[in-house]
UniProtKB/Swiss-Prot annotation:
NCBIfam families: CoxB (TIGR02866). The gene is MT-CO2. It comes from the Eukaryota. Disulfide bonds: none annotated. One of its GO terms (molecular function) is copper ion binding. It comes from Pongo abelii (Sumatran orangutan). Keywords: Copper, Electron transport, Magnesium, Membrane, Metal-binding, Mitochondrion, Mitochondrion inner membrane, Respiratory chain, Translocase, Transmembrane, Transmembrane helix, Transport. One of its GO terms (cellular component) is mitochondrion. Cu cation A1 binds at residues 161, 196, 200, 207. This is Cytochrome c oxidase subunit 2. Residues 46-59 are mitochondrial matrix. Component of the cytochrome c oxidase, the last enzyme in the mitochondrial electron transport chain which drives oxidative phosphorylation. The respiratory chain contains 3 multisubunit complexes succinate dehydrogenase (complex II, CII), ubiquinol-cytochrome c oxidoreductase (cytochrome b-c1 complex, complex III, CIII) and cytochrome c oxidase (complex IV, CIV), that cooperate to transfer electrons derived from NADH and succinate to molecular oxygen, creating an electrochemical gradient over the inner membrane that drives transmembrane transport and the ATP synthase. The chain crosses the membrane at residues 15-45, 60-87.
């Protein structure tokens, strides 16, 4: 989960998020290299007294600064396209959960368990217990198994929302009249937090998402819900 004054990404809890972290480091390395070379060239330009004002054509240099950026863009685009394909890939899910966005709470439907439906509201400060997180904890958590592919069906009943859990690398828009889907496989148990990431009105910041991921064997004994 996130920490105060955190600069980096949250700890990855799914294969997709691990790929995103690797791609982030890959792109950041290229950006740092470009910035270093540009600053070094500026430093040499400002400090040296050697100038040549008679050069009007330099085919070799023009070729280099045309081909080199193209190569850099390819080095960034190829892994990005691979991750984009992986995020859109829908594997055979073991469980399907439907999430419906409202102003300003979420409704969840466990379609594989007798159509269990419940709402998830943010806990007001007066109801927080020791250890609860302000503006992030909810009255009803979504309980899911780890090491099992889960499909989330996401939509909205009023305005645009976005169902987002950073640790899992998930961000899917909830659009009225449209049903979007995404899949994920959590790699370790724990409690993971997210929020609506689409400005949806006055209480947009009061739409947290809490996933409680438990071992598959425990989940198979019977879904444990915090209702």
């Amino acid at each position: 989960m996130a920490h105060a004054a955190q600069v980096g990404l949250q700890d990855a809890t799914s294969p997709i998020m691990e790929e995103l972290v690797i791609f982030h480091d890959h792109a950041l390395m290229i950006i740092f290299l470009i910035c270093f070379l540009v600053l070094y060239a500026l430093f040499l330009t400002l400090t040296t007294k050697l100038t040549n004002t008679s050069i009007s054509d330099a085919q070799e240099m023009e070729t280099i600064w045309t081909i080199l950026p193209a190569i850099i863009l390819i080095l960034i685009a190829l892994p990005s396209l691979r991750i984009l394909y992986l995020t859109d890939e829908i594997n055979d899910p073991s469980f399907t959960i439907k999430s419906i966005g409202h102003q300003w709470y979420w409704t969840y439907e466990y379609t594989d368990y007798g159509g269990l439906i419940f709402n998830s509201y943010m806990l007001p400060p007066l109801f927080l217990e020791p250890g609860d997180l302000r503006l992030l904890d909810v009255d009803n958590r979504v309980v899911l198994p780890v090491e099992a592919p889960v499909r989330m069906m996401i939509t909205s009943q009023d305005v645009l929302h976005s169902w987002t859990v950073p640790s899992l690398g998930l961000k899917t828009d909830a659009i009225p009249g449209r049903l979007n889907q995404t899949t994920f496989t959590a790699t370790r148990p724990g409690v993971y937090y997210g929020q609506c990431s689409e400005i949806c009105g006055a209480n947009h910041s009061f739409m947290p998402i809490v996933l409680e991921l438990i071992p598959l064997k425990i989940f198979e004994m019977g879904p444990v819900f915090t209702l």
